[in-house]
Amino acid sequence: MRFTFRPLHPHFVAEVTGPRLQDVHEPADLARLRAAMDQYAVLVWHDQPFADDEQLDFAQRFDGVLHARTSLAVLGRNRFGNDALTDVSNVDEHGDIMAADDRRRVSSVSNRLWHTDASFVDPPGRYSMLSARVIPPVRADTEFADMRAAWDALDAETRAQIEHLHAHHSIAYSRQVLGFEFDAAERDKLAGVVQPLVRTLPRTGRRALYLASHASRIVEWPVPEGRLLLRDLIEHATRPEFVYAHEWHVGDFVIWDNRSTMHRARPFDDRAHRRELRRTTTLDID
């Protein structure tokens, strides 16, 4: 099958044209897409609608085991009854726009912070795939930042200082930053994990910063200095020259590599407009 890749940014991101992904089954075709992910880190399709079962099937064909340990799973079953299909929306189980004080909505607001999916579990997330089902009539973009280019742009002294450090990641921390509180039982399920601050990508050998708002501290440093370092690195890594903003349209499908990027949702009036997307994320295992 023939795929065409059109770069959308000087460092990363490409728009893909070619066959419907529901029809992509051959190992060679899937390998071609994975090679493109190694190069671009974010791939964008337009006019690529999915039914839920089709998206789940493709995600498993593309990269295997799916992540199902989201913060919303701790708050209760999602409206699809399958935690491997993350409900990225402002819609409740009755099909209504969520109330302003709905805990799921309040938790999801933290997605406006820069993050990488599932860095707070072991194994973490590898590829995330987001399918646009209902898009508001106003901009409600997702921004992506290239962590490989951000690493490349660091000076040699900073690289040497940070390359062997580790950060503790917890989704409870990133939610608490914005005032969301989990109860004791919920916190027990969200203890978090330690991740390297810098990762080496296995197929390319490129290095990338591994950052997220979930990162609460640097394990090897005192908490104040570690948090200041994390803030400085996120500020560096999200400079405009490293960022691509995706304007969503119904039928868009975007895959990104969580080892190579961070992303964040941009705000819109979620009390006036519906926004429904479905996300699948694979686990970073061999």
Language model regions located:
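Fe(II)/2-oxoglutarate oxygenase catalytic core
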Residues: 2-255, 259-286
